[in-house]
Amino acid sequence: GNTRVYFEADMLYNRRLGKHDVDALFLYNQQAYDDGDIQDYRKQGVAGRLSYTYDNRYVAEFNFGYNGSENFAKGKRFGFFPSLAVGWLMSEEPWMQKYHNIFNKIKFRASVGKAGDDKIEGRRFAYLTTLNQSAQGYTWGTTGQVNYEGDVKGISEGDIGVSNLTWETVKKYNFGFELGLWNMIDFNLDLFREKRSNIFMKRSIIPSQSGFINNPWANFGKVTNGGVEMSL
């Protein structure tokens, strides 16, 4: 049957000093999943968060993840993924209080961060070369393949391992605006942009004399997109 083992340990810190709020978290996690395959699925990582708020008006938060994946060779398994966010709750400024019955919320926020993906479609351990155990057998004389209780199959290379594969990454940028009116209407606006790089793709043009049976994987894809989201 399937078995899953998950271990997590964390440390928390929270303190308020006058108008200052500080919150911190450090977390370690490790997981293994066995679905009856030859090799377990394993991941390991640490994460942290540090946030600061001043007088419920100014907010800053830093997050990070340092994650390891089984899908990459030693030296390429771990990736560092940080993010930073800041915010200003303008409606909490003293000079805005006389308008609070109209503008119950005015908030500006911005963030930048980096995330990673280790999933290679239909392939585990892409840094290892695979072997095909059902290749054409040896031929002797004029009798064809060796027969001993059936054909004796040969072994050939399948996918060639690529040792420098590493995490696919995406950098995210966001600017947001939140507006609340008369405690009845909420309006949100988000401008975002994403730059994805090191995308897992198979090389499409490989010379036949290279000897590759199948085109190898590589981190070379790039995609950039952005947009605007609004809600009312």
Q: Where are these predicted regions, by residue range?
A:
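Extracellular/periplasmic, surface-exposed regions of secreted and cell-surface proteins
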Residues: 1-232
